[in-house]
Amino acid sequence: MQFSEVKQRIDRVEQCADEAERAVQAGSVPGELRQSVDAMHQQARQAQQECSSGQQGDESRLRDVVMQLEQAGDRAMQACRNAGKVDPQVQQAVQRAHDEASSLKKQLQMG
């Protein structure tokens, strides 16, 4: 996978995480969900910074960052499930961010 493609995908994850964060702020959701979405958004921003400042050759570092991003997405999804009845817009936004991160992680692992 080309570095520029990874960067684009990370940007997409960040946009989805940003959407999820806005949806969470607009609705009334449990603190755990709010915190996990915030953490996922911060992780996406960190991944973006890593791409901007990092050397293109540092694949293992990039893989680690994407792995952490996907784990943050997992935690946000779990918090969504734990919250029970959540606004569908929040649920969909969290799901999209999680799916983007998972998909990127799988593609990076395949090479």
Where are these regions (language model features)?
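Generic structural signal for well-ordered, non-transmembrane alpha-helical segments
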Residues: 4, 11-14, 18, 38-45, ...
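A generic structured-segment signal
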Residues: 23-27, 33-36, 79-83, 93-95
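Residue-level signal for short amphipathic helical patches enriched in basic/charged
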Residues: 1, 54-57, 111
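Heptad-repeat alpha-helical rod positions in long coiled-coil/spectrin-like domains
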Residues: 15, 22-25, 49, 53, ...
